[in-house]
UniProtKB/Swiss-Prot annotation:
It comes from Idiomarina loihiensis (strain ATCC BAA-735 / DSM 15497 / L2-TR). One of its GO terms (cellular component) is cytoplasm. Its main location: cytoplasm. This is High frequency lysogenization protein HflD homolog. Keywords: Cell inner membrane, Cell membrane, Cytoplasm, Membrane. It is found in: Cytoplasm; Cell inner membrane. It comes from the Bacteria. HAMAP family: HflD_protein. InterPro entries: HflD, HflD-like_sf.
Amino acid sequence: MNEWQQRVIALAGMSLSAMAVQKLARSGELYPESISNTLVHSLLQQNPDNIEDIYGGLDNIKPGIQAFIRQAGSNKNKDIEVTRYLIGLIHLSRRLLKQPDILNLLGERITQVKRQKEEFEFENYRIQQSLAGIYRELISPLGQPIRINGNPEFLKRDSNQHHIRTLLLAGIRSAVLWQQVGGKRRHFVFSRKKMLDTAQQLLHVA
């Protein structure tokens, strides 16, 4: 994978998270379940061999690549709400990268959750509950919280709150990854075509 492919894959991870948050907040459900599984998988992969492994392979991140193309393209399919979520994820991730102590603690806490899943076979709900707690304790205090729009009936459910925070944490993970592989905000202005061309190429590979 070249640097642009890596950046687009990370952006696809962010886009998948934002899209999933919107869908869950509006409908109270997230289908297919593989989307959530891919994002949780990305959180628990701390020493991957390559960037695709973070998401369990290119096939799993394909919906995120498609979502990124919709958001970054010049067509009418852009969703302002998803864009706002993406901006919020980038903002919080930049704050996180400026606090290495919090970043290290985040890694330690996620390692604990990974151990719970592998050694004690915790159910998905328990894993989401743990990951949501990490988001609430370590990410939320970093700055202006990401305001989630949706159906109040769905948003007040504890299970959905845990799920949304887990999805946001996965989005933060992808946003950090994007910056670690050289992603810059100016790329959205000066390198948009390059990113979109790369995304289209990845779709044909995935």
